[in-house]
Amino acid sequence: MEKIIMIGLAVMLISVPAHAAYVTAESGLCVREKPDEESERVRVLPIGTEVDGEITDGWMQIGDGYISTDYIGDEDPLELIGTWRVTAYAYTGSACANGEMPEMGRTIAHNSLPFGTRIYIEGVGVREVMDRGPAYLGTEWCDLYLGDVAECVNWGDQTREIWLVK
């Protein structure tokens, strides 16, 4: 938060400590070396990461760098669903169950979550339910669209924490 204090004709910008906030950018938030969008990227914080630091001119200073306050909010954008089995599938030549074509970096299949539901898969990122899968796999499972059979084989069958994007 920033406070502007006017003394006569002079204006002073005072930095104040921030309360806990959360990364809201679904694609992650870049930590920069300096408080400038053109500055070198140090790393990326995933959606839902809790951050705390001093805010000045729209930038929060955290440990090793700065993040833009445009992409943080007061409420955690994620709700933990649980630990699921995550498999992968490749392009079959047809549209997803919702009628759209599958997209790398966007599509997952799930048996019961409504189409359009966005979930965060640990270590993968945010994906959208666009397709359905075999009912025998249950509801604590999702199928990640990777688009390439070799990538799917390499992915295998993994277990990951899953969060609902609110």
PLM regions with names:
Residues M1, A18-A20, K166:
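Short intrinsically disordered terminal tails
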Residues E50, T56-G63, D70-K166:
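Solvent-exposed, well-ordered loop and adjacent helix/strand elements within mature globular domains
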